[in-house]
């Protein structure tokens, strides 16, 4: 079965801005290497409508399209259901995490996706979906 990955917003920002970590770790490099590996394995990257909306608060449509261009043949789009959105709102309130993070964990769970993030909020969502940092998967 082909693996499918959901890449959190922070990882796309790491790539686009070639960000470094607190100890000068090459976060952008780790993330890019993972995407190259996903492409080489002919696995898929899943984009959600919510991810696109988050990126649009930071970047122009042209910049976002540029981010995805090299990977367009392995991209699948998923639109979160109303039921998933309602569950995310409930979990976000109960666990004090952003609703978008809860939504990505739920979408990952419901679609059998590998969730890639370095956002600490996902530690509170481990029972919904396990998550990995890019460097753990390359």
Positions of predicted regions on the chain:
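Acidic, PIN/NYN-like endoribonuclease modules and their adjacent C-terminal/linker elements
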Residues: 1-2, 105, 109-138
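Short, well-structured N-terminal submotif of metal-dependent ribonuclease cores
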Residues: 1-46, 58-63, 138
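Histidine- and aromatic-rich ligand-binding microenvironments
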Residues: 7-8, 46-48, 97-98, 119, ...
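A generic structural signal for short hydrophobic patches within well-formed alpha-helices
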Residues: 12, 52, 122-123
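Short, flexible helix/strand-to-coil boundary loops that buttress conserved ligand/catalytic motifs
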Residues: 16-17, 59, 92, 126-129
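A short, hydrophobic/aromatic-rich structural module that often spans a beta strand
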Residues: 51-84
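Phosphate- and divalent-cation-binding pockets in alpha/beta enzyme and binding domains
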Residues: 54-55, 87, 124-125
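Active-site neighborhoods of divalent-metal-dependent phosphate/nucleic-acid chemistry enzymes
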Residues: 76-114, 118
